[in-house]
């Protein structure tokens, strides 16, 4: 039976993001009373398809599409109020009532226009200097986390006190404008139409940033909350909570393909720190894993295929899987499933179970390859090394598995899958040591195979 009191589930991506977490979070909220975002910012994107209608979310937790479910943005999230209200207005136009159900931690650091300007200028300076781009979304996520770690960030709670906000903003602009103009040479860069209203001569201006922040303050005040307290109280009252990770494990600042990573911890352990609950409140960790691998932007990718070449398996994955980033629209690089990578993700997340997504994309491929390990400096290793430098030197070791021609689209029972599709999934379980509890066979809520429900009591 489904637990009726106080069972909490963490959903994390196990690859480089884009694994299909949004659909599964939406599916699981049928059994939850609250959904929590605990890290990242509006650099992450989730696409939900409900009754054939696509909805893209970047900051608002995916559970907002379920009437009556409370949604929380925890202290681990860096918040662009401008982007949040763009999203709120779009959802309200679509008929989703959410302001009374959305709670935002007062401890969230704010993303402000100078953070995005720093992001853009740094990538431009790297390119100008002949260095490889990190592949950021240019939305100010990294610089906002830098201010947090340096203990100088403006936080949501500062918006309640205009004089305090103005003083801190002046201090931050003095610092960041010096970096922009003197170190990065920002006068020479084109910052685009989004940042133009806030800038002059390569510097970010005080008044437009302050005025916009004060407008947002009035709108945010009804949603500001002590999220840590509210989550703990909800748990004590028996609510089921769902903690929604953004991006993926291999983008984690500590455990990912450093330095080609994001600026936050994407692993399950951060669900506690990023929302203000104790680790004992996290009962089940669901790892979302695409049936093949994709990656957006730069960085090592051991099993990458020639996904731009027509007629190849990689091209099949790219086109059939519609592999374009939700946030940036960039094409995702595609490759074979990497079980050695998944072993690393299982280790650092403490996965309870797996959900394999986009299995249907592999329909029609005659044969599939599974990476079981790598050759690294003449030795065989069965788990992904730490950091980009070692991963770049890895040569994948593959097993070949026969594909299937029958469609898996919309299949809702495991034993109704083609035989080779079942063998493929079972081999993933064997290599990684993590049981598969769910399989997604299409983008809609109903296109799901359930073997064990994460909210099922132990």
Curated annotation (Swiss-Prot):
Cofactor: Mg(2+)
Binding site for Mg(2+): 18, 45
Signal sequence residues: none
Catalysed transformations (reactions): IMP + L-aspartate + GTP = N(6)-(1,2-dicarboxyethyl)-AMP + GDP + phosphate + 2 H(+)
Cofactor descriptive note: Binds 1 Mg(2+) ion per subunit.
The EC number(s) this enzyme carries: 6.3.4.4
Residues where IMP binds: 18-21, 43-46, 137, 151, 247, 262, 330
PROSITE patterns: ADENYLOSUCCIN_SYN_1, ADENYLOSUCCIN_SYN_2
Superkingdom of this protein's organism: Bacteria
MF terms in GO: adenylosuccinate synthase activity; GTP binding; magnesium ion binding
Pfam families membership: Adenylsucc_synt
Family: Belongs to the adenylosuccinate synthetase family.
Biological role: Plays an important role in the de novo pathway of purine nucleotide biosynthesis. Catalyzes the first committed step in the biosynthesis of AMP from IMP.
Name assigned to this protein: Adenylosuccinate synthetase
């Amino acid at each position: 039976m489904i637990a009726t009191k106080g069972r909490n589930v963490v959903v994390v991506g196990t690859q480089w993001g884009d694994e299909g977490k949004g659909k599964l979070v939406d599916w699981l909220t049928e059994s939850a009373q609250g959904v929590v975002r605990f890290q990242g910012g509006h650099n992450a994107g989730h696409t939900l398809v409900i009754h054939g209608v696509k909805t893209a979310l970047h900051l608002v937790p995916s559970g907002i599409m379920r009437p009556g479910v409370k949604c929380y943005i925890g202290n681990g999230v860096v918040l662009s109020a401008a982007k949040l209200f763009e999203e709120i207005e779009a959802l309200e136009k679509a008929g989703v009532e959410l302001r009374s159900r959305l709670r935002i931690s007062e401890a969230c650091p704010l993303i402000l226009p100078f953070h995005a300007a720093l992001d853009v200028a740094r990538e431009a300076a790297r390119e100008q200097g002949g260095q490889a781009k990190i592949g950021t979304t240019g939305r100010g996520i990294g610089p906002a986390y830098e201010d947090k770690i340096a203990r100088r960030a403006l936080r949501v709670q500062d918006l309640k006190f205009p004089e305090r906000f103005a003083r801190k903003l002046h201090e931050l602009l003095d610092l960041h404008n010096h970096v922009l103009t003197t170190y990065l040479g920002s006068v020479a860069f084109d910052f685009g139409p989004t940042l133009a209203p806030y800038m002059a001569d390569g510097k970010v201006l005080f008044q437009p940033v302050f005025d916009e922040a004060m407008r947002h303050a009035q709108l945010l005040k009804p949603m500001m909350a002590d999220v840590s307290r509210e989550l703990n109280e909800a748990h004590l009252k028996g609510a089921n909570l769902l903690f929604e990770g953004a991006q993926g494990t291999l983008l984690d600042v500590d455990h990912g393909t450093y330095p080609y990573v994001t600026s936050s911890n994407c692993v399950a352990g951060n669900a506690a720190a990023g929302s203000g609950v104790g680790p004992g409140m996290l009962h089940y960790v669901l790892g979302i894993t695409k049936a093949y691998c994709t990656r957006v932007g730069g960085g090592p990718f051991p099993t990458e295929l020639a996904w731009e070449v027509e007629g190849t398996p990689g091209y099949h994955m790219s086109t059939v899987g519609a592999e374009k980033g939700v946030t940036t629209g960039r094409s995702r690089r595609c490759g074979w499933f990497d079980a050695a990578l998944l072993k690393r993700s299982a280790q650092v997340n403490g996965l309870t179970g797996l959900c394999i997504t986009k299995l249907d994309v592999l329909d029609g491929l005659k044969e599939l390859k599974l990476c079981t390990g790598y050759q690294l400096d003449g030795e065989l290793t069965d788990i992904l090394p730490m950091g980009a430098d070692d991963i770049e030197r890895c040569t994948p070791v593959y097993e070949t598995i026969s594909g299937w021609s029958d469609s898996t689209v919309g299949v809702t029972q495991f034993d109704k899958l083609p035989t080779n599709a079942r063998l493929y999934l079972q081999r993933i379980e064997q290599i990684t040591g993590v049981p598969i509890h769910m399989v997604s066979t299409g983008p809609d809520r109903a296109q799901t195979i359930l073997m064990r429900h994460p909210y099922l009591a132990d």
